UniProtKB/Swiss-Prot annotation:
PROSITE patterns reported for this sequence: UPF0034 (PS01136)
NCBIfam families assigned to the protein according to its UniProt record, in alphabetical order: nifR3_yhdG
Gene Ontology MF annotations: flavin adenine dinucleotide binding; FMN binding; tRNA binding; tRNA dihydrouridine synthase activity
Protein encoded by which gene: dusB
tRNA processing found in the keyword field: yes
Residue positions binding FMN: P16, M17, A18, Q70, K139, N200, G201, D202, G224, R225
Disulfide-bond pairs as recorded: none
Known role: Catalyzes the synthesis of 5,6-dihydrouridine (D), a modified base found in the D-loop of most tRNAs, via the reduction of the C5-C6 double bond in target uridines.
Record organism: Vibrio vulnificus (strain CMCP6)
Domain of life per record: Bacteria
EC number: 1.3.1.-
Record keywords: Flavoprotein, FMN, NADP, Oxidoreductase, RNA-binding, tRNA processing, tRNA-binding
Name used for this protein in its record: tRNA-dihydrouridine synthase B
Similarity comment: family membership: Belongs to the Dus family. DusB subfamily.
Active site: C100
Length: 322
């Protein structure tokens, strides 16, 4: 699949997730089979660009793979400015967020709250496309609620505005992440536009990935929450799509190596104070299916020092293997 002039190495894309798809996580997913990774959402409000954490996350020069940066907001000019800023800092693709259902985003009329206002959507899309000379993509949902699904209209509008690919989550804004994603809307959008369509929502296994691709006719898949604590899911899905067979479960030693490497990367990226705190949620995701890990997770979450976190993880896996 191509987005503009960029050829993805496969059909599997890491979904942008606030507080999750930072540089260490994106690099890890790319290493384990993802064809592209989209950065976590960046606000179009320049006042929020000044924190050290934001500045650190905004620099994309030197990253592996195709660098896609997601921006969010409701003011067309601020969105255009954010797109230009991102390109100046290494973005090769700009992704516009109109899919996030979070209240703190929606109350600012950003994310999926915009689905009620196609006129504003059109202004934003045109402003961003005109502001940069890189491909612009859009991530959105099927509609405001189940009675107001307007994804076909939004998809056609996006295509007319110059959007070069569309990622569609199979839920409405009102659904948040409840219930199950539906794929009929994605199938209908794929049939309605000629730009690439990327299916998103509940793609949590190789078999589900194959089903969604075949049912919707989508050009690619976007995977978010199922990759938390399992970044190798992209490798598993790619193998299944190519060969029709499932890979064996990763040996515990390889899981240990991946997790320790990820935690070390977080420590190095965020520093001695913030790194261990961010590592906690990732370790929780890695160990969520380990029945014996509940007590360890509580202990681990109380550890503030980077070196002590690594020692604790070594000890945990030594006990599991013994």
């Amino acid at each position: 699949m191509k987005i503009g002039n960029y050829q993805l190495k496969n059909k599997l894309i890491v979904a942008p997730m606030a507080g999750v798809t930072d540089r260490p996580f994106r690099e890890l997913c790319l290493r384990y089979g993802a064809g592209m990774a989209v950065s976590e959402m960046m606000s179009s409000n320049p006042q929020l660009w000044k924190t050290s954490k934001s500045k650190q996350r905004m620099v994309h020069e030197g990253e592996s793979g195709i660098r896609s940066v997601q921006i969010a907001g409701s003011d067309p000019q601020l969105m255009a400015d954010a797109a230009q800023f991102s390109v100046e800092n290494g973005a090769q693709i700009i992704d516009i967020n109109m899919g996030c259902p979070a209240k703190k985003v929606n109350k600012k009329l950003a994310g999926s709250a915009l689905l009620k206002y196609p006129d504003i959507i059109e202004q934003i899309l045109k402003a961003v496309v005109d502001a940069v000379d890189v491909p612009v993509t859009l991530k959105t949902r099927t509609g405001w609620d189940t009675e107001n699904k307007n994804c076909i209209h939004i998809a056609k509008l996006a295509e007319d505005c110059g959007i070069q690919a569309l990622a569609l989550h199979g839920r409405t804004k009102a659904c948040m992440y409840k219930g199950e994603a539906e794929y009929d809307s994605i199938k209908a959008v794929k049939q309605a536009v000629s730009i690439p369509v990327i299916a998103n929502g509940d793609i949590d296994s190789p078999e589900k990935a194959k089903y969604v691709l075949e049912y919707t006719g989508a050009d690619a898949l976007m995977i978010g929450r199922p990759a938390q604590g399992r970044p190798w899911i992209f490798q598993e899905i790619h193998h299944y799509l190519e060969n029709g067979t499932t890979m064996p479960e990763l040996p515990i030693e390889e899981v240990k190596s991946i997790m320790l490497g990820h935690v070390q990367a977080l420590h190095e990226f965020y520093g001695e104070y913030l790194g261990p705190r961010i590592a906690r949620k990732h370790v929780g995701w890695y160990l969520k299916e380990h029945e014996q890990a509940s007590e360890f997770r509580r202990t681990f979450n109380a550890i503030d020092a980077a070196m002590l976190q690594l020692e604790a993880l070594e000890g945990y896996f030594d006990n599991v293997a013994s």
